[in-house]
Amino acid sequence: MLDLRMSSAVKVRVPDCLPGRLPDMELVGYLERWCLAPRSAGGNLYLHHIIAGDEAVVHDHPWDFQSEILEGGYLEMTCDGPVERRKGDVFSKRAEALHYIMTVRPGTWTRITTGPKTRD
């Protein structure tokens, strides 16, 4: 069972029994993802445990999204250069925004809210 008593900064109410990690959404050695609400075409809510950087794999997403750093943090490479993401940061990204995660602090957890899919 996932212990979300990481700090008072964690403000999500997690159900008593989290759904299992979604195997199709797990990037082995990099990211573990839990669905916090039923998946829908209008958007989704996820809890991410980021384990390691993206190995310099520049990518975008099929949807706009908002991220909140709940614990830890990471260094992200963007088209405008590196950006340090820290505990408490909340930011939004457009689907077409290219980026990758360079380095990750141990114990990094984020809450991701996606919008509807806008492209493949």
Predicted regions and their residues:
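Short, conserved beta-strand element in jelly-roll/cupin
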Residues: 60-75
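Short, charged/polar surface micro-motifs in flexible loops or helix N-caps
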Residues: 41-43, 52-54, 71-75
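Conserved short histidine dyad/triad with adjacent acidic residue
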Residues: 44-61, 95-96
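Ligand-binding loop in jelly-roll beta-barrel domains
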Residues: 94-120
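Substrate-binding/catalytic groove segments of enzymes
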Residues: 75-77, 120
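A generic "structured core" feature
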Residues: 59-60, 64, 85, 93, ...
